[in-house]
Amino acid sequence: LAELSKGLVRGGEFELVQADLVLSTGRVVGLKASIINLTLFEDIFQYTLTGQIVIQDAMSLASTGPIIGQEYLKLKIKTPTVGEPDRIIDYSENAFIVTSLDLREPTSGGSQVSILSFCSREFAMNQRSVVNRTLTGSYSDIVERMLRKDLDSHKTFYKEPSAESKKIIAPNIDPFSVISIAESRALSKKHSDPTYLFFENLRGFNFRTLGHLYSSTPMLNYSQYPAGQKTDGKGSIDIMKNIQNLEEYTISSAPDTIYNHSAGVYASNMIVHDIFSKSYENYTYNYIDNFFNERHVDSFGSKPIFPLANVLPINPEGDDIADYPAKQYLQPTTGKNFDNSVQDNFFQTPFTPHNPQKSMQIRNAHMQMMNTALQVNIDVLGTTVVAAGDIVECNIPFSGTYTTTQNEVFDRLYKGRFLIKAIRHDFNPAENQHTMSMNLCKDNFLEPLEAPEENYEPKSKRSKGTITETWDDIGL
């Protein structure tokens, strides 16, 4: 990062090294001089990258090419001062696939504007592939096999090893469906973390847990700098402050109590039926009780962390918000220590069964929490240094018409470490400007909330009774 600002005139500069469209006829058309805008989307809840490119089509390429949705887009974009291969957007070899021509609109002078949508090649491979075989090994190895063999991907793969030997019988399903099974059931080998995510960012494919993502060192520190603070002592632009300045921000989400109850974020019950021993067991998940045994965005920071809820009794019996397991699960399993439903070539049973009690409730709580956690959308100047799945620091300014006794500089909740859930990259070649719109989230507080002992849910002490009413028909 120290080298990031050296040689830049201002934040958001980029170098468009290559932009070639390979037509279905084999003709290669250079687009560097024709691009009006280029957009790339990366998201930790999307398996592949997608994007759109807007071009000034003076040659009526959409017609004469023609562009029919079977083209390849070769891209290579970099921040001028960044030389590390994993910090360069390089799709010159693993080209994008153009999926559709979304718009052709005539402009003055006989030209036209065309908008093309594209995606990673692996998405197209998935749509035309079927898996109909038995897969064995750890879930992380099965995912790698899907990626390398069935999706024929040669991109970098960041893999966190998972535990135990498993067996998946794939009945004519696509590779992403196999990956989805592995993603939902895998436990990390080192930490038994069930929060695996499979996604593609600008560096490659990832099969990693939320805990692994949270353990990363923050890439950048975003804050809002007044105009006078974005220059150095000599009056020149301070590039790092320019890059890390919050141009715009919107607080987009906060905890949703009703959703968290119904989705099982706060609490859930699970009945696991063992079809081998004809027995069943009950398991209860409690968000408050489990909080400090799980990993959160700020678990790897220097400050203490607290649940994303106020831990106070809501009735005289002392129940808190996590004492109501409204979400119910019913899951089967096969055997205590082995999966007796499948055997290897030597008629042994080396595969461990699916144990939903180890993963399902915890995983579901974390995945659903990502929808209702503390989220903020920020607009900043672009750089190829950060990608979806990274950790950044972000401090939203305190906003209020009065000054508190603490004289806060930053918002009490929206500060510290955040996970990048999604990024929209916009490249404007005419202005040589790269901007990013990022969705950041965090699932913990950095300070405890005051929890008075008798702050119960208010309700009337007396019932107002029931009024029974009838009505007369009109004689039909």
Regions found by a protein language model. Give the residues of each.
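Sec-exported extracytoplasmic/periplasmic mature domains
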Residues: 147-152, 183-188, 394
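An acidic/polar, Gly/Ser/Thr-rich interaction patch typically located in mid-to-C-terminal regions
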Residues: 40-66, 229-476
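Extracytoplasmic/secreted envelope proteins and their assembly/folding machinery
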Residues: 140-144, 179
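Envelope-exposed proteins and targeting segments
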Residues: 17, 49-51, 71, 92-94, ...
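Assembly/oligomerization scaffold segments
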Residues: 1-128
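N-terminal export/assembly leaders
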Residues: 126, 143-170
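Short beta-strand-centered interaction patches in the first periplasmic/extracellular domains
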Residues: 113, 120-122, 158-266, 282
